[in-house]
């Protein structure tokens, strides 16, 4: 093995390995399946007779501790450790429902004959580039393994019973006099019996697949890989030279015709009809002609396939059960799984991803027959970074979905769903998860006063803004880091234009003259503060109102008159300097009591306050999560929608992770500009949708009818997750017996049950 990933398997045979990820094949509708199948056929046809390749599907059981470590939330020695322990326990119980106990990986190993490493390298590199490009065309993520990664993979396959890490350095080879084999070899190998083998404390058995079925099914490989036990499936494929293949088939047809003539002569001599020939002969002749036609005119190639299945277990009894289960799957598709008696060692070595086949049992198949073993089943999303968040279980495989939105190109997100679909619950669960596993600040715009209990439980701050409240937010607040530009006033002016449009603008919004006047006045009222930026010099809405009154244009007087009720009238809640200290890590702006007139203005002012916080946090290299409930309210007016879209675009660069929560998809797509919110959101958590919204979303997000069924009349907590280019159906059955569930549920039945339990406890006391 060489550091760059090239392995010299024999004196003149060199191989490399590429690891590839899964894509959703079984979830797709028939047209998409056909497209993937055709793409896979083209992929296989790339390999000529000089390239041998091996597809390896490795499902190895991980110890419980391995997964426990990957999902455990580290304790931080504060009063929330009890909640962290409970959340970790919830994740472990969810994990037990699926088969995440298996680590499933897929590899393609390819090799060429060459006189030397120097001659092999350029060929392998060219083939590697072509393979990665072919995977990319299929929408499959793939990467080449270096020497260390290939050795780690082999070490894992040869030490299935030991959780010990792989320890190796290229610098150790020369001083020790050892080879790479010494660092990956298991403690013991045993090939005493002809029907099984031992590796370490595990026992295994290698079988080969006899393909007897006249037609193959694309579910067969998927069914093997769905087995809930350790398993290695290895497919060695060798392309046959096209000219040789056609010559061989023509020769066979000639032989069959010769035999047919002999049978006809025999029939004439015996005195019966010469058309009566053995049925097998007629069948073989027809099949051979059909095969020749496929090779000559249907872009098919001829391949030789060796299909090996390695079952591994802790003891002989379990191994017998696993082998029986694998055999049953083969029989279901009219094939047979046969043990490689007295060839267990050769079989196991051939199953290792080295691209070297020692089993000379090959079956000739055309491109489409080999391609029917589609190597794609169901995509999984299990990221084990320290900021990965729980999103439910994969509805197809029952495996945990854990994702880190910050790894996306654009972490902005949307939570969409009809009332009662679990929208608010999902948002609260994510907020709690973010609080427990990250150091990010969390800000919530809460138009319906739903988030208070959760925020208070997390020792956060609820800022109640209403006409009767004494909590004030100044919409004129300006942080000197407000914008990337040298002049922070440009973006602030945009915000004030949006605010004035909500207050003044009619059906057509602000007129160009009105926008000019407002912009002029904004620059004037900030002049003193920008020359001496002290808090007491921060302008308020009344300063803007007075400046407008000083202008000569009649439009200025019109705008000032419209502002009057918000300055000196009964709606003057936003005509004060900010008196709330929003430095708490979790802050919720409760604007429920603002009333219809002020609610949209309140949401816009909150958005501006959040932007101020984001700019401050950016200086401290800290992320800010912002959750906007009832987001559609901000998108109805053109200017506020434009400002929201602008902020949505800017958030990513400034370390912000915004999440819009809404049931009104139509408002999200009401204009081309607002569609930018979808285009700038790589994370969409979609719950049950109304029929009109489903059609809009299907078109916007290119969702197939089959995928759409997961958000049609779906139960609470069920839907589709869009994470970058990945689309997964999910189910979130959050345990109801947890403290966290009681804090975040909004269902009246659950809340009344809690009240009843509390009353019982009081009576008992």
Where would I find each of the regions flagged by the language model?
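Hydrophobic positions on the alpha1 helix immediately C-terminal to the Walker A/P-loop
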Residues: 426
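A short helix-turn-beta junction within AAA+ P-loop NTPase domains corresponding to the substrate/partner-engaging
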Residues: 459-463, 673-686
